[in-house]
């Protein structure tokens, strides 16, 4: 590793000399050629630093590459970001953001979208859900512009799940419901994804329950059954019907029993569990109106 570092330092020194030559060097050499050669040496330095596991220095060498050849800067900023992810995620994001802006402004929307999604994944991994949601939203917009519907859908679902994992206030819930409905409808349009629609619709229904809107849950469920008849006969569709009936009857034991039976066969993930716990609160809040 020490040998790699010394080679990296040597390349870096040569690159700096190419970048800032003396008076005679400036007179007798072409600036564009000098910068191109300097960039190549900085790149070599970066790769040697990488082999020597000095990721911060490797990233700095790629940043110097970007300064030498601005037309390729997005590529070098992206490389710097990849290296810094190992040591400093906030610095990595800074360089990823620069790369995204350059890619988007030059019309390379697909590449910008992929990088924006990477940023979102870093924030999600660091449990910074608000920032993750913002970046997944932006990534979804870019994927839509690039006509990459499948990846856009996955980003929309991330927004819906992470935003409601972070906060179950009414506005956040309603936005998430719309996203689940939109993606569910899109899934139904393709044979490969139509069987995934029921999961989107189930998540939307339990969000209505968590929002203490039993009428909305009933109406939505009927609407989803009309759109996707297979949902009505699925375990998720039946569970949604049973939970609504339990809430209507203010029957906590039955609500818990139905969830227990379902969970024994198909374990509920953390997100569904959190939403269903909030939905269970409706059993305390909901009472049938007394018309006697």
Predicted region positions:
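Internal amphipathic alpha-helical repeat/solenoid segments
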Residues: 1-70
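Residue signature of alpha-solenoid helical repeat architecture, marking inter-repeat boundaries
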Residues: 2-6, 10, 29-36, 56, ...
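TPR repeat positional signature
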Residues: 4, 11, 35, 41-42, ...
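Amphipathic alpha-helical segments of tetratricopeptide repeats
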Residues: 16-17, 46-47, 54, 66-67, ...
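Structural motif corresponding to the intra-repeat A-B loop/turn of tetratricopeptide repeats
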Residues: 32, 51-52, 71, 86-87, ...
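Solenoidal tandem-repeat scaffolds enriched in leucines and small polar residues
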Residues: 92-172
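Structured C-terminal portions of repeat-based eukaryotic scaffold domains
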Residues: 137, 149-292
């Amino acid at each position: 590793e020490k040998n790699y570092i010394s080679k990296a330092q040597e390349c870096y020194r040569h690159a700096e000399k190419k970048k800032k030559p003396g008076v005679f060097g400036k007179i007798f050499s072409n600036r564009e050629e000098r910068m191109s050669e300097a960039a190549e040496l900085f790149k070599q330095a970066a790769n040697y630093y990488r082999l020597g596991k000095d990721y911060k220095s490797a990233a700095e060498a790629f940043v110097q590459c970007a300064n030498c050849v601005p037309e390729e800067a997005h590529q070098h900023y992206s490389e710097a970001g990849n290296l810094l992810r190992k040591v400093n995620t906030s610095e990595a994001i800074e360089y990823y953001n620069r790369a995204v802006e350059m890619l988007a402004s030059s019309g390379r929307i697909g590449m910008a979208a992929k990088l924006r999604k990477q940023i979102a994944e870093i924030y999600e991994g660091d449990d910074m859900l608000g920032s993750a949601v913002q970046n997944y939203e932006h990534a979804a917009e870019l994927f839509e512009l690039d006509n990459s519907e499948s990846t856009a859908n996955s980003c929309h679902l991330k927004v819906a799940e992470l935003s409601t994992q972070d906060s179950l206030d009414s506005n956040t819930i309603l936005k998430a419901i719309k996203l689940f409905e939109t993606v569910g409808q899109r899934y139904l349009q393709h044979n490969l994804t139509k069987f995934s629609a029921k999961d989107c619709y189930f998540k939307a229904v339990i969000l209505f329950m968590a929002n203490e809107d039993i009428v909305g849950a009933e109406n939505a469920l009927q609407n989803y059954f009309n759109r996707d008849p297979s949902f009505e006969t699925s375990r998720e569709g039946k569970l949604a019907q049973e939970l609504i009936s339990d809430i209507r009857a203010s029957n906590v034991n039955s609500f818990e029993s139905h969830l227990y039976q379902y969970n024994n066969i198909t374990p509920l993930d953390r997100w569904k569990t959190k939403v269903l716990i909030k939905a269970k609160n409706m059993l305390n809040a909901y009472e049938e109106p007394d018309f006697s």
